[in-house]
């Protein structure tokens, strides 16, 4: 994982945590939690690719691993839709920029997870 992606995650999480979206702050906190979870999952998948010795243990747990991967892709799709929705309804330029960058980051992370998972299959 490159350092730009790490700093992008940290930057977006910090900016999202500063936003005050009124009654939807619980939803925003949920999005932040999912972003953090997604980052950890992506990082662990990347580490597994780097240590190909883990490939054997992953294959032994293949059913569970595939189910978890599928769940993560569902989370990514939900987050993408949620971020797109927020982009449509917000008029604040700071929020628009933050959500645009979050959307771009989600698409990058989805691609990275796909790449890692294909290497592990």
Curated annotation (Swiss-Prot):
BP-aspect Gene Ontology terms: exit of virus from host cell nucleus through nuclear pore
Main localization (coarse): virion
InterPro entries on file: Flu_NS2
Transmembrane intervals: none
Family annotation (Gene3D superfamilies): 1.10.287.230, S15/NS1, RNA-binding (1.10.287.10)
Entry's Gene Ontology cellular component terms: host cell nucleus; virion component
Record key words, sorted: Host nucleus, Host-virus interaction, Transport, Virion
Statement: the UniProt record of this protein carries the keyword Transport: yes
Pfam families xrefs: Flu_NS2
Protein localization: Virion; Host nucleus
Motif Nuclear export signal: where in chain: 12-21, 85-94
Keyword Protein biosynthesis carried by entry: no
HAMAP family from the UniProt entry: INFV_NEP
Further remark: Average number present in a viral particle is estimated to be 130-200 molecules.
Family: Belongs to the influenza viruses NEP family.
Assembly mode: Interacts with protein M1. May interact with host nucleoporin RAB/HRB and exportin XPO1/CRM1.
Record function comment: Mediates the nuclear export of encapsidated genomic RNAs (ribonucleoproteins, RNPs). Acts as an adapter between viral RNPs complexes and the nuclear export machinery of the cell. Possesses no intrinsic RNA-binding activity, but includes a C-terminal M1-binding domain. This domain is believed to allow recognition of RNPs bound to the protein M1.
Protein known as: Nuclear export protein
Natural source organism: Influenza A virus (strain A/Brevig Mission/1/1918 H1N1)
